Amino acid sequence: ILRADSFKKPVFYNGSTFLFDKFAIFLKNNAHIIKINNQLHIYKDGIYTAGYGEIEAAMIKHIPDLNRAKRSEVVDYLDLLIRDNTKPEDAHLIAFKNGLYNIIDGSFVGFTPEHIITNKIPWDYTPGAYCELADKTLDNIACHDSQVRLLLEEAIGYCFYRWNELGKAFILTGDKSNGKSTYLSMVQNLLGEENICALDLKELGDRFKTAEMFGKLANIGDDIGDEFIANPAVFKKLVTGDRVSAERKGQNPFEFNNYSKFLFSANQIPRIKDKTGAVQRRLVIIPFDANFSKDKAGFDPTIKHKLKSPDTMEYLINLGLAGLKRILENRGFTDSDKVKKALDEYEEDNNPILGFFKECEDEDFHIEDNTTDLVYSRYQEYCLANNLQAMSKTAFSRQIARNLHLHTEVRRIGKKTARFYVAGDQK
């Protein structure tokens, strides 16, 4: 056994001079320090961990009295010494507390430094694990809807997968006391605090906030605000795993491909600027219709605490893995009538002109073959009645063309002319 005193001077000191370069090379080779996305990582407990803190902790194991200045010197040298990035392991290999599970072939192996993984679920993988309480809770949360239940399981499994292949974000909706926070609490406890962050939708794109998602399995935003999101560009990139730039205070900016999954809960989903529908295509809106109140039979105010047990977590792991296998096999999530309805309703809320179209349909008002002035005037009345900001007439006509495939055409009415919305090819 090497003691710090015995090798300190002959190996890492020349007289009183600290040989920071030799010590850095020693650490690199013996503590398995690499770069991922230009960020230094060190191998610890089966995975590679980012951050200078763990690297400095490894230093003082060898030289306990190494001061901060010398530790910083070593870190700076490591940053220069290690120039190339190491590619992380494929997403199909998932780390649990007791080993690595391969979602493709179902194999389970031990940890080695050769497997470059940066996240570990802090619970054991136990085939066949079951928890009756968790099973019943998920059924109750889903209101015994099998499609919703499968989606809840798939959302868990999708968090295990370090790749945003499907480009989807989950939003759980509904009033209070319906199980949203209980479900998210289970997911948070399952993934572990070190694997999650908690940004609101409106915070995405803030200068230093995006960096918080680097290396996380999930961003879990409970009870997000309903403020209008005017610039969702960063959100779209993060959901699809496109490369984004991030920055930590006092450090150089860096780029990364996000694999963190989004799970938000909201009483009311914020409106998002989405002219092309690109944001809406990324959303999976799951309605939570249950009612867990004090006057209901079986109400348990301690349910969140009870659902933190190892039995619950190991059962959720099995459900999540089964859900992930379904996702990969089907190349998508389980279809749900409730989810489709919720998404259609949000589309109407998010793009008020769709609500106007629906009102026209309900009241048998035909946009086609009506004058643009009359239709726009009716649209303004609709906005006024619903406390909405009306878009300009030009923008309104663009929306008519995009959604209803109508263009404008000048026609004569008696001695006057007027512009009408018409179908067919534009002349």
Describe each PLM feature range:
Residues 1-29, 123-140, 355, 412-427:
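Replication-associated primase and helicase/ATPase modules
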